Amino acid sequence: DTTRQLAYVYSEIGEITRSAAEREKLAAAAEDPDVARDELLTAGDLYNQTGALAEAARVYEEYVGKYPEPVDINMDTRLRIADIHKELANDTKYYEQLEAMVAVANEAGDDDNDRIRLLAANAALALAERRYDEFAQLQLTQPFERSLPLKQDGMDRAIAALEGIVNYEVAEVTAAATYYIAETYMNFSQSLLESERPVRMTQTELNSYELLIEEEAYPFEDQAIAVHEANYEFMLTGVYNEWIQKSLDELAALLPARYAKQENSEGLLRSVDTYTYQAAGATEAPALTLVETAPISDEYREAFDKALAQLDQGEQQPSIDNLAFLTSESPMVAASHINLGIAQHQAGNLEAAEEHLQNALALGVAARHPVVLTELGIVFRKLGRFAQAKDSYEAALSAVPEYHFARRNLGILCDLYLADTDCAMREYETYSAAMPDDEEVAIWIADVSNRMAR
C-alpha cells in the first residue's frame, strides 16, 4: 500500500521517473499476474513519457519476455521498443525487434487479429525497405562477372521480402510493397543502363555493347511499369494512399501522355473585395462578378495585400499567420478565408485547407465561388475523396459553366481516378473547344480515344 501511495504521490507532483520506479516494485511484488503485467507496462510508459528511453526499453523488454500474451499488447510493446531504438539510432536492435514482431505474428494462431496483422505488416515493410536500400546501393561495375550476380541476388532478396508482405492483407502496406517491387525492377534497369563500360573497346564494339545493354535493361523497365500500373489499378477497388499516388507519379514520368495529368487552379485572389471571371476569348461582359458586402477598412485592405505579397515572395508561414488573424478579426470577409485555404493547400496542410475553404463557402458571397469549389475539388482528390471532388467541380461548373479550370480538373478526375473514360472525353472535349491552344489536353483526348477504341 505504501508503494502504491508513493507511486500516486510522485505522479501527482510531477516526479514521473520516481513514480515509474515504484510501479516496477508493485509489479515485482504483485501476486496477481494481471496486476503485475499492468504495473510493469505502466512503469515502461512512464519512463517513456519522461524521455528516460534506456529505462523504458529495459522495462518494455522485461514485459515482452514475461508476457507473450495478450499477443496484440505484446506486439504494441515491441513496437515501442523498436521506436526507442530507432530514436537512439541503434539500428541493430531496431531491426531485431522488427524481426521479433514478424515472428510473434506468425505464431499468433487463433490470437491473430487485424491489429496484429497491421503491426506485423508494417514491421515486415520496414525490413523489406532495408533490403531494397541495400540492393539500390549496389553498383554495376567491371568486371560484370562479380558485380552482376550480387545485384541480381539483391534484387531477388528484395522482391521476395516485398512479395511476402502481400500475405498480411493490409491494403496500405500492400500498396507500399507493390510500389517498392516496381522500383526494384526500375532500379535494376537503370543500373544496367548506367553500368560501367568495359575498357579497350573499339567504337563498333562499344555500339554493339550499348545495344546489348539496352536489350537487357528495357524489359525490366517494362516490368516496373506493369507493377506500378497494377498498384494504380488497386485504387479502382476503392483504396487510395500515398503509395498509390507515388506509383502514379512514377507512371507520369514513364508514360506522360497517359498519366502526366496535373490539376491546376486559378490560385490566390488578388482583390479583397471584387472577383471577376472572364471566359477565354470572350469580349462581352464577364461571366461572373462577385462583390464583397462586408465592410472593409483601409487597414484591413492593406493587411490583405501584405499577406498576398508575402505568399508571392514565398513567405508562406508569415502569410498564413496574417491571413488567420484577418479571418478572426473580420470573419465575414470571404477573400481572406479563400486565400488562407489556398495557402494551407500550398503548404501541404490539406485538412486545414479544407476547413478554411469550407468556411468561405459558408459565407453568402462565396457560396458558389468557382475558385473555392475548384480548389476544394483538388484538396478532396488529394485526400482520396473522389466523389466529393467530382461534386465540387460540378458545383463550380454549375455556377459558371465556362470556368475552364474546373472543366479541365473534372476531366482529369474522371480519367485517372474514376476510370470513367466517357466523362473524361466529354470534359476534355468541352474544355478543348473553349481552350484550343492547350496542346496538352489535345494529347489527352487522343490517349482517351485510343483506350476507348481498345
Regions found by a protein language model. Name each.
Residues 11, 48, 86, 311, ...:
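Position-specific recognition of the canonical hydrophobic site in helix A of tetratricopeptide repeat
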Residues 2, 36-39, 73, 175, ...:
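TPR alpha-solenoid repeat register
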Residues 5, 39-42, 80, 180, ...:
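Canonical tetratricopeptide repeat
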Residues 137, 145, 293-329:
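Alpha-helical segment of the N-proximal tetratricopeptide repeat
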Residues 335-400, 405:
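Alpha-helical adaptor scaffolds
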Residues 8, 45, 70, 83, 129, 172, 299, 333, ...:
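Residue-level recognition of tetratricopeptide repeat
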